[in-house]
Amino acid sequence: MNASVLEASYPISFQKKEAEKLGEYLRQRQCVNLIGMKRVGISNFLRFFLNHPDTIPTYINQKEKHLFIPVDLNDLVEQEIYPFWTLTLKRIVDVADQSDLSPEVKAKVNDLFVKSIQFQDLFMVIDSIRHALVLIGENGMYPTIFFLRFDRLKDKFNPSFFDNLQGLRDAANGNLAYVFTSYRSLVSIFPEARANLSVFSQTMYAKPAHESDMRIVYDAYRKRYKLTLQPPIEKALFAVIGGYMQYLQLGLIHLNEVESSTLNTEKDILETLLSDERIVLQSEELWESLHVEEQKILMQVVKSQQVDALEQERGRYLWDTGFLVGEKTLSIFSPLFEAYILHLEHDESKKKKTAHLTRKEHLLFTLLKEQLGEIVERESIVEIVWPESQEFGVSDWAIDRLVARVRLKLREQDTPYEIQTIRTRGYKLTPLKE
């Protein structure tokens, strides 16, 4: 158990249905593709699953020893194949060092990492991973690698990539399992690997959480950050967020910043959250993650228009991931997201009339201008623009979208600056060349 991880303190009943299903797959050593809408709470659930001391005996096996190895692709400085495998090997070493493996085995695993880094050869890195996983298996542990945000590699796929993943499983005699998290299925992200993926990946969808699970998360935040919300406000908050974890986190931040005593109804909560730029940006990220046909279906639902059988088939993702709920009468999972969709057209027309910078856009521009001509890294942007969200994390999409908005408005305002993207590092504001 990692005591510093908040989710490790959740009751073992947290998201029980999902934990039972994932645990059964891992008991059978099957690989899983865990799919959910962006920021729905997969990371929150997995932090619980990976760190709670009772996860393995409760949901997998009381007698077996399992080694969970999380590899978060957000930690990749470069979204390339070689850094990916190097990060994977490093995380295996990190987890092995903290495990019950003998000092001799730990030393061997560490030695594999050191040698592979010295030669900087892709084949040697993958071979070192193979040796490390075999060592772990031979010493009575079942390794499971959790590749978090695996879709970040979608542009770097090559035919041998999944062959190498399968090769590692074969070398471990089937004792190695993978869990891939993504917002779309691996088959749709890597269509060239369809044949490989069908062999070893089971599909599991993560939908917005039930209110009882949201209550667990809320209570943990409330105790850690000493939040005080009146029961009617709590009830209204749960009603408008619809089980969406990022809305809960951003909503609590917003309500902690404003005078919540003036808020009495669900309508009050909805209106104040809709005024928060962070929540609007999160809703936009959700909307932009959808295909045009899926967006059209959601627009039909909020306008109470019929969705026919063909549209339902094409928009299956909306039902699988929980964007849409209900059978006879369809509805959007969250009144907050529904309100965003209804305001889309109005917001678009409003954007065309003004090029004024919003608060976060102004923070970003000021930061870049203060370091004119210098690279400002993503971490610095998060620290200045999203200080309240550092613990929860800020997605690449949110940063890129904010930069794109400022870039567009600078052109509309005819300012003498432009924003340059520095690949894998950050952004730089430079004077326009005449």
Where are the regions a protein language model picked out?
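The catalytic "switch" region of P-loop NTPases
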Residues: 3-5, 141-144, 154-240, 254-258, ...
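N-terminal pre-P-loop "Q-motif" helix
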Residues: 10-22
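P-loop NTPase nucleotide-binding core
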Residues: 24, 28-154, 158-159, 242
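Winged-helix-like regulatory helical subdomains adjacent to P-loop NTPase cores
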Residues: 234, 239-321, 356
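Short capping/hinge segments at domain boundaries that bridge a core fold to an adjacent linker or tail
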Residues: 291, 323-349, 429
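The N-cap/first-turn positions of alpha helices
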Residues: 294, 360-364
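DNA-binding patch around the recognition helix
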Residues: 325-326, 352-357, 399-434
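Positively charged, aromatic-enriched patches within helix-turn-helix-type DNA-binding elements
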Residues: 355, 364-401, 411
